[in-house]
């Protein structure tokens, strides 16, 4: 079939398998052209491995450090008549390129929050890898079924303690719109912490440790975003921020556990990028469009792969990691450069419907958004007939 983009709200409901493959190849080429990661990991588990930062971590480990990788994700395959999810196509492409390079690459499809998927992962590590020396935790999910209670909990993006009004882009109509968010209830805050906080990360590490599949010296990292003042009301000081602060609490006990075997655990702070998760946050399209404009003009703009490859090379496996006072690894310092933030803040209230494309890089934002789904990739013929039914040969699918 011939597949064109169809966008509804913050989701593109179609995906392009050839475009997704080309996007993965571009990221692999970036890593291989920038040289190997010295003293990098050799056997890596990535939880949330199919898109965005998790995919970039899997690519950086495999093609930067020659690592064997096991990826966990929750995606949907295509059929002859309907495209699958972008993460399915990304993972199919990654596995093919990694296998061609002689690397082990295998994936587990299912709910990473579940005990079942944790057990299947442990069994697969024992059978195929023995032990892993890096665990990357990169889950972004709107809800979680708690494995112990069976309760399904939802996360909420709301401020805490006050109503917040802020500007944003209505990405469908391409107009500036004011949005009012009411404060989160305590139940909503608790739910967000349960879904997006550190409990599941800790459950993963506890399960892997008890099963004896963590190598001596193993490291783990979970990805987070802090942002600057302009996003704090609805992010760091809001319900999501409470979940992110929970990561900072949970990492301490995880670090103690791994340190007993010479290992380490860190929260890694990454910059704002276009992902399926960030595009759902009402103010982020405007913030990202301004940030892209300012950072591109300064020559410091980066996407997922640049961020994560840099994090691996400079901090996770670097001699002098970028650490903050809380012990987090920082890869977001270019975004938080005071000059960059000052310009973003200056432009924030100047943007109107008329000058949207002039004052911001909304065009670049839209391109990056479509690239998530395999569109707008150079060299791909979007008028060609493609088969949406792409197989991942050795996948362990717990959803069927």
Curated annotation (Swiss-Prot):
Q: Which Gene3D superfamilies match?
A: NAD(P)-binding Rossmann-like Domain
TM stretches of this protein: none
Single GO molecular-function term? enoyl-[acyl-carrier-protein] reductase (NADH) activity
**Entry-linked InterPro entries:** Eno_Rdtase_FAD-bd_dom, Enoyl-CoA_Rdtase_cat_dom, FabV-like_NADH_b, Trans-2-enoyl-CoA_reductase
**Entry annotated with the keyword Nucleotide-binding:** no
Pathway involvement of the protein, from the record: Lipid metabolism; fatty acid biosynthesis
Q: What class of enzyme is it?
A: oxidoreductase
Plays an important role in discriminating NADH against NADPH, annotated site positions: 75
Enumerate the residues binding substrate: 225
Keywords on record: Fatty acid biosynthesis, Fatty acid metabolism, Lipid biosynthesis, Lipid metabolism, NAD, Oxidoreductase
Any one biological process term the GO annotation gives: fatty acid biosynthetic process
Enzyme nomenclature, EC number: 1.3.1.9
Active site located where?
Answer: 235 (proton donor)
User: Mind telling me which Pfam families this protein's record contains?
Assistant: Eno-Rase_FAD_bd, Eno-Rase_NADH_b, Enoyl_reductase
- Swiss-Prot/TrEMBL catalytic activity: a 2,3-saturated acyl-[ACP] + NAD(+) = a (2E)-enoyl-[ACP] + NADH + H(+)
Q: Which residues bind NAD(+)?
A: 48-53, 74-75, 111-112, 139-140, 244, 273-275
Please state which protein family the record places this protein in.
Answer: Belongs to the TER reductase family.
Q: How does it assemble?
A: Monomer.
Function, please? Involved in the final reduction of the elongation cycle of fatty acid synthesis (FAS II). Catalyzes the reduction of a carbon-carbon double bond in an enoyl moiety that is covalently linked to an acyl carrier protein (ACP).
What is the name attached to this protein's record? Enoyl-[acyl-carrier-protein] reductase [NADH]
Lineage runs: Bacteria, Pseudomonadati, Pseudomonadota, Betaproteobacteria, Burkholderiales
